[in-house]
């Protein structure tokens, strides 16, 4: 990282901001290093130059506001720019934005330089106005300095590697101004207005005009998942127009902005899906009820008993043996309440808040490190060098994630579907829908489920009875669920208790609660399955290296509340297993229903397969833009 003086100079002394055709942004420091001693290999000598830029981009994502759509687009456009800079010097490969073909006496050096200028220009332009721009731009400058590439070389004319990289960046940035994202308008959709008034989280219940449509939340103190304060306490929808963004491999979204349409989610009041709507809200309550670390329930979460699901289901029973070792997977016994909480927090936005697509870049980089140096694209053929592996992997992976964002947000924008907090509070406020003969009947109320969703009565609120703490609320609906955020999350837990349905909240920090966009389909599920498909195709195996991957959440490391009580090691055998758990985590976290998750997995699979097939056409020179 640049010293503070240099970071300040990088912002205060911006002496040249040049826009060429709406695209090429050149930012130069007011100082020039007297000497250049390459330091690229000091920390990670095994990293390719493409990996260095990918890591710098992930750092920028961690600092910025967590908008998955925008960051995924940046990941893809940067990956495509690096691919083009590599492909220029390959006689066969097809470029994505630029189709130049050049030769060089030192192809490896030319590629490194062209890739760096392309990535630097794109990233500087995309993150100059973001939160954390000071640090991010300084890091981008530092990468260039460490590689001995002067950042004041801005020409896009000619055949030098720097000019090639600048020319590619210009093409990328010009393209981005007309790709349907409304970059010039801050990626906003000026035509979108929520149907429902805001749900005030710290007040009971909710008022909804349409219980099937998205409802923004109003929070007293709103902070993004990576800790950035947000001034307006009412959520603004992120990316309703994203289904109209130009894709990598999936079809155009058409006038509706829906590239892949599996049909609508369950709807309250719809003859065919009313019961599914209610049942899936109950499923979220059930998952919430399992977040109790004092329950004493211990479960096995090893790949030997979990995973191997059919696409779009949780019907798997695990893998009989590890195909690498030939041995059964060892049991992995954990506290049930610890599992749900650790799973939710791990998959929230990645361990360092790089958003789901960024998290899958982290996973992919780790896989690459473990496979190196035996890097065979598709799991067969000759081993390739790390740069070729990385630029091809990033093109396929982030092309898939870009399309996953378009597909998922196309459905979010088109169906504008409700989130669980609104569903549960709305139905719970109306009453129960199970028995017209019982009090508080409403056909749009919550179904009664023994020991989970119950009608509060004088008998159940009597001293010592299960609803005693809810005395005075007879006739209302109680749910057994996570009771909310404790005052001190480092030393206390909210616990699982009987609470009023109108007070239900998801297992999230109180300054976030639920993402700022509709539920259907789950972005986590779509991104994760798309990434799993690419990693399976690219590595030639659905299994992680060694047949297993894992993450340990240390005792006491949770952020929402105290816990876990002991170390929890999450495990998965295949990329698909990991992706399914990412989707499932959103139910434990209370921000998606099963329809959001399963549909996301299905359309994510389509995105990933299409991207892998399309990427191979670019590799072989058979792509047609």
Q: What is the predicted function of each stretch?
A:
Residues 2-29:
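Secretory targeting and sorting signals
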